[in-house]
């Protein structure tokens, strides 16, 4: 069984895979202050919830966009499973052909998104990963990573809206009843949710126009479920 850890700016996703199937997936908050022991306790508790014994873990892999936390997570895995986790990064052999100006700059999260997408879906691909930032990746019909786009994330946009204005309140991320809203809170919800959904629709159109062909579109990340249902493109 493989223990997989995805370290994002806001959340850490932990899961186990066996024989190509996902045994479970859970999410905890990313804390740059936590020690290896604190993370080890969290991971051990999650494994116990799913009745997975530490000696059942044969290997571990980490994808991280938070360098200051990466080593701490690796030490935490060593504590609970007694194994050295592999870290996805420059030099990791994934088989992905990366055609960008500096392949070493491509984040590990985008690498694993692309590798998984190529494995599971019909090419060419557009992959949206919606977390603290929203990233859009394009993989061509040959399975090569061409590049993409980085967009302010849903919560980043919402927080900027409330922080930069004096009279706009903090709101929950839930859809209003109508796109054309009639009060401040619903107008903000409409702008964030339908605005982000329209942004994604527009990016897809522009990517496909530049590629000259239709693509399979995939969305992942903690905030995708809040936005993707309101996209016109399926």
Which residues does each predicted region cover?
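N-terminal glycine/serine-rich phosphate-binding loop of ATP-dependent small-molecule kinases
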Residues: 1-3, 7-92
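Gly/Thr-rich phosphate-binding beta-strand-loop-beta motif of the actin/hexokinase/Hsp70
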Residues: 1-25, 117, 123-145, 161
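ATP-binding/phosphotransfer module of carbohydrate and carboxylate kinases, centering on a glycine-rich
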Residues: 2-4, 157-234
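Glycine-rich phosphate-binding loop plus the immediately following alpha-helix
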Residues: 31-38, 106-108, 113-122, 127, ...
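Short phosphate-engaging motifs
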Residues: 35, 69, 135, 157, ...
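Generic hydrophobic alpha-helical segments
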Residues: 39, 43-47, 113-117, 121, ...
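Short beta-strand-loop/turn "lid" adjacent to the catalytic site in phosphate-handling enzymes
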Residues: 50-106, 142-149, 153-154, 182-193, ...
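Glycine-rich phosphate-binding loop signature in dinucleotide/nucleotide-binding domains
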Residues: 50-55, 120-122, 210-213
């Amino acid at each position: 069984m493989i223990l997989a850890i995805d370290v994002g700016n806001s959340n850490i996703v932990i899961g186990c895979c066996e024989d190509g199937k996902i045994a479970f997936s859970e999410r905890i908050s990313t804390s740059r202050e936590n020690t290896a022991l604190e993370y080890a306790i969290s991971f051990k508790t999650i494994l116990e919830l799913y009745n997975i014994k530490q000696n059942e873990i044969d290997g571990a892999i980490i994808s991280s966009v938070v360098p200051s936390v990466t080593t701490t997570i690796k030490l935490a895995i060593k504590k609970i499973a007694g194994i050295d986790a592999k870290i996805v990064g420059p030099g990791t052999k994934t088989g992905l052909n990366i055609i960008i100006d500096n392949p070493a700059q491509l984040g590990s999260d985008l690498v694993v998104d692309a590798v998984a997408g190529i494995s599971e879906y019909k090419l060419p691909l557009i992959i949206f990963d919606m977390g603290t930032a929203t990233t859009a990746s394009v993989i061509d019909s040959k399975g090569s990573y061409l590049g993409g786009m980085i967009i302010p994330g849903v919560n980043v946009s919402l927080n900027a809206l409330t922080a930069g204005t004096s009279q706009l309140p903090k709101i929950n991320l839930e859809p209003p009843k109508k796109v054309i809203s009639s009060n401040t809170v619903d107008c903000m919800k409409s702008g964030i949710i339908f605005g982000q959904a329209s942004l994604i629709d527009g990016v897809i159109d522009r990517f496909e126009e530049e590629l000259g062909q239709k693509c399979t579109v995939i969305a992942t990340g903690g905030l995708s479920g809040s936005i993707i249902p309101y996209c016109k493109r399926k």
